Amino acid sequence: CISRYEKSPSVKVVPQDMVEIPAGNFRFYTKRDPNTLDPFIAFPDFSDTVDISMPRFFMDRYPVTNIQYKQFLTQTSYIPNDTINYLKYWSNGSPASGTEDLPVVYVNPDDAKAYAKWAGKRLPTEQEWQYAAQGSDMRKFPWGNMMDSTKCNYNLNFSTPVGRFQNGGSPFNVMDIVGNVWQMTSDVYDNGSYYFTIIRGGSYYHPTQSIWYVTGGPLPVDHPEMLLLIAPGLDRNATVGFRCVKDSE
């Protein structure tokens, strides 16, 4: 891993629209279903189990939405160097009416980090994301060990406004953490052949009988996926968003 942790300004009190992730012991383990592996790309083996003592931190209750990202643009006038595919679903610099509360997509890691820095936050590490989604008991989904289509966006074939599935929270009440859109982490790798970041959670889109798309649908919280970083415009797509974390004093 060549890029993981960038400290944010720290606070004591839970910030607005974030939840407290208390300190605790956590067994970090990742697993990919061998049936979902792309035969053309050698995915790295992250199957080691590591016991970690997690510090207290804060995480966004929901993925960053279109309206939140619009506020960032209004206040900063941020424009990426490469605008290919940037906010592709928007028109004239704004999200379409009725989509304000959808997770923002068609942003790449640099776009997400720019937002996070403006907000006084940062992207989560893989370990932070999984601990916030899973807690300390190694459950497979935020709510337990069995998939439940009433608790997340399960094959609806479109993204949904954040907060729609209020019964699908994690042990710490982090919402929309599986399904809807993939979420970026700060973990970036270079294995000598590929430069990639790790995304988590799955998305609403579930391709059938195709090896050219990553596995879709809501996925277990211990499932990592590799997002190849090829070029800024190509690193943006319709099913990857992000949420932020903030350090605690």
Where are these regions (language model features)?
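Intrinsically disordered, low-complexity PEST-like regions enriched in Ser/Thr and acidic residues
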Residues: R4-Y5
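Periodic aromatic/glycine/histidine/acidic cluster detector
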Residues: P9, A231-P232
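A short glycine-rich, aromatic-capped structural motif
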Residues: S10-L87, V107-D110, G179
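Functional-site microenvironments in short loops/helix caps that host divalent-cation chemistry
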Residues: I21, R27, L87-M226, G233-A238
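Acidic glycine-/aspartate-rich tracts in secreted/extracellular proteins
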Residues: V64, S77, S136, D187-D190, ...
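Short, structured beta-strand segments at or near domain termini in extracellular proteins/domains
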Residues: A238-E249
